[in-house]
């Protein structure tokens, strides 16, 4: 689960919702559109893009600092794929497979039928599903803080707690996500007023029905069989100090994937925030090694 209301400067980001969108960047300006590429180099229509998938309460903007590094070498597409569905307790609430279908449809709508795929946390489960079930579209895979099974006793307890707090004590959930999502070193850089401001903004500016929906998707995650089917080159990246998806779970997911290699980032769960350069470097080293 991401805490999208925090940026490297402590600013707040509005939660995005609705149908899948792709962030488009040309030079220093940015906007949101249906389909587009982020790039810092001359356009090459045949170049395979990197598609980025956010986590449970995340949005495409979470990747901004990572994208600054990636686009020096590769075009990037980042999607807001978690379209809200009315009635989060409904049997019609989305599953990982629904999110996967949305990602593939959005990429295809832009004429991108082959891509490298990066998923974070819940997005890693979505990426795992896509790599297995749409294998012809996925050239390589990077899974960041991924997990394979949301009903694991520890993961289920965590997601049940998130869901309870999202409904009853949003401030407590914000505090919990700060404590468990960030490393001690990174969190210690914020003073008390900044931390309180982050929590207040997290409560005020999030799309809570969407978050509840996506926590329910977390609980239903089971991509163990899909992981075994992945044939594309795969990198599993672990946050050394991750308390939300502890290293055991990323290891467990990687062990299911025949092609998986492993890397570790010295950060908590939110590595895209704590160590964006390290994270981008690990991605690029892998991707450029496989596809120079």
Segments predicted by a language model, with ranges:
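Gly/Ala-rich beta-loop-alpha elbow adjacent to hydrolase catalytic centers
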Residues: 119-123, 127
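Conserved HGGG/HGGXW glycine-rich cap/lid loop of the alpha/beta-hydrolase fold
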Residues: 37-89
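Short beta-strand/loop motif that positions the catalytic acidic residue
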Residues: 230, 236-238, 242
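Catalytic histidine-centered segment of alpha/beta-hydrolase-like enzymes
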Residues: 267-280
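Flexible "cap/lid" loop of the alpha/beta hydrolase fold
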Residues: 132, 139-169
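Active-site loop/oxyanion-hole signature of alpha/beta-hydrolase fold enzymes
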Residues: 65-68, 77-118
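Conserved glycine-rich cofactor-binding loop
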Residues: 29
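Conserved alpha/beta-hydrolase catalytic His-Asp/Glu region
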Residues: 152-154, 172-226
């Amino acid at each position: 689960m991401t805490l999208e209301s925090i940026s490297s400067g402590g600013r707040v980001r509005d939660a995005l919702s609705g149908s899948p969108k792709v962030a488009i960047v040309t030079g220093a300006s940015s906007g949101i559109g249906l389909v587009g590429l982020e790039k810092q180099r001359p356009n090459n229509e045949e170049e395979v893009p990197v598609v980025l998938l956010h986590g449970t309460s995340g949005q495409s903007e979470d990747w901004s600092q990572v994208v600054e590094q990636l686009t020096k070498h590769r075009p990037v597409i980042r999607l807001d794929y978690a379209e809200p569905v009315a009635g989060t307790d409904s049997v019609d609430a989305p599953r990982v497979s629904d999110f996967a279908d949305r990602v593939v449809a959005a990429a295809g709508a832009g004429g991108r039928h082959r891509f490298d795929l990066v998923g974070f946390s819940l997005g890693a489960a979505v990426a795992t599903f896509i790599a297995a079930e749409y294998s012809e579209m996925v050239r390589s895979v990077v899974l960041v803080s991924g997990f394979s099974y949301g009903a694991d006793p520890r993961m289920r307890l965590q997601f049940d707690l998130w869901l309870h707090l999202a409904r009853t004590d949003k401030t407590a959930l914000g505090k919990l996500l700060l404590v468990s999502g960030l490393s001690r070193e990174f969190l210690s850089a914020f003073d008390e007023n900044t931390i309180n401001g982050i929590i207040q903004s997290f409560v005020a500016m999030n799309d809570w029905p969407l978050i509840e929906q996506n926590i329910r998707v977390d609980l239903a995650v089971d991509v163990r069989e899909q992981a075994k089917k992945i044939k594309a080159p795969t990198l599993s990246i672990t946050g050394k100090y991750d308390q939300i998806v502890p290293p055991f779970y990323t290891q467990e997911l990687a062990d299911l994937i025949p092609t998986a290699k492993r890397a570790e980032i010295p950060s908590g769960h939110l590595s895209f925030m704590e160590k964006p350069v390290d994270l981008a470097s690990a991605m690029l080293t892998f991707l450029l090694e496989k596809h120079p």
